[in-house]
Amino acid sequence: MTAAAPRVAAVDCGTNSIRLLVSEPSPEKGLAELTKQNSIVRLGQGVDETGRLNPEAIERTRKALAGYVETMQRLGVEKVRMVATSATRDAANKEDFFSMTAEVLGRVQPGARAEVISGEEEAALSFAGATADIEPDRGPFCVVDLGGGSTEFVVGKQAVSTQMGCVRLTERFMRSDPPTAAETDAARAYVRDTLRQVAPLLVSARTLVGCAGTFTTLSALTQGLDSYDPARIHMSELLFDDLTAITSALRAQTAEQRRANPVVHPGRADVIAAGSVIVEEIVDLARESAGLGSVVISEKDILDGIVAGLA
């Protein structure tokens, strides 16, 4: 009798959130999702300014990860991979964080601990996950993974990792609530300058694909959803003009007003205004350099790329 294939788990810890995906091999689907969870822990709080991880942020992350480990144990996970992205790449005291992850993840798989992955590997894993459900004839794809500290762009095997994300821009430029016009202009100038290195990638793209929380939240808002519904968000296609109408309205609101909307995660309400500036500049670049007019939103991303590599 053939033994059942092991259940696998992926954990992605970024600047703003830590997320879990548990999957098992399925004859029909290849990989069947058992659970997907998301917690806003703001691990990268202050890293852009201090160069160090805040001990309170590490503790918030530890508590969330311990909860994920309980879920993995309950579901019988045998293999886990945890990746840590922008915030830990930048931190002088990153070893405090890694020691914590080794202690917590070791309860599931001895020897497991978070890995810092390069921006290029992050982009490749995101690309594999984000494009899994899109018809191949819509390629070449440009996948944009907009995070808290960095944003990755990938077209095929070419990738660019940029030092701009919704937390980084909020802390560096957009500190008022709501942000002032001068703050927004400064953030926009930084994003526009950063995107110069991305322009050569975008020229060949036929479909723009957006993944991660800023894009998925903007999809829910653009569609006017009453609650966050992954099934309606995944593979939704947003016209640039509809999207930018929402982003400009978001920046006029306070964080508390954004938080009152049921589709906006409370932990994202204070940084999505900065995320909206990044989205607007990406949209302008995609329109100018590739003649595109819409973006496909994917609920699948780096987590799906990781579990595919484990199964």
Label every PLM stretch briefly:
Residues T2-A32:
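N-terminal basic/disordered segments at the start of proteins
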Residues A3-V8, V22, G46-E70, R74, ...:
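Helical "lid/coupling" subdomains associated with nucleotide-phosphate turnover
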Residues D12-S17, V144-S150, C211-F215, K300-I302:
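A short acidic Gly-Thr/Ser loop motif
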Residues C13, P25, L146, V155-G156:
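Generic beta-strand structural signal
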Residues N16, E78, G293:
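Short acidic/polar active-site loop segments enriched in Thr and Asp
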Residues K29-R42, V69, L75:
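N-terminal glycine-rich anion-binding loops that anchor highly charged ligand groups
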